[in-house]
Amino acid sequence: MNNAIRARVAEIPADFLKQVRTEGRDALGQQVKRVIAEGGEPCRDVLRRANKGEELTLASFSPFQKPGPYHEYGPVFVLANESTETIDRTAVPAGEDGNYLQQRFAIRAYSENEEILDAALVEPDAAQETVDRFFARTDTAFLHVRFPSYGCFACRLDRS
């Protein structure tokens, strides 16, 4: 795992995954979109890129729990069916083609009240330093990593 970000990676909520897979509804109650992977789509539930031909679900998701100005919804890809893959929740692979985060991505720091404190657009080789700097702030409760081109939520990082 070249340039892996070391932090505790939060799982996407099981109730969200169950809802999109069994009911076909996303976090906003909208019908999800089923797609066949072209290959390379970021699969949020398994923290890897999709393989060509895999069945995926595209659904609206919010990584926030509290109401407020930063509570937003956005698209995420998840595998259409439950996976038995083992997922490393202690690091996120970044940097090389095929890795979940690949190249440049955004990291945002949030308070306990889910208000944004800081943000940075980083290359994989600077990611760990940015994560460490954001977590050095005592008011940082968690971080979000996002794909900058489409703005999609990649993952939530908590203190190890």
Question: What spans do the regions from the language model cover?
Answer:
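Short, hydrophobic/π-rich interface segment
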Residues: 103-142, 146, 159
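C-terminal edge-of-domain segments
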Residues: 153-160
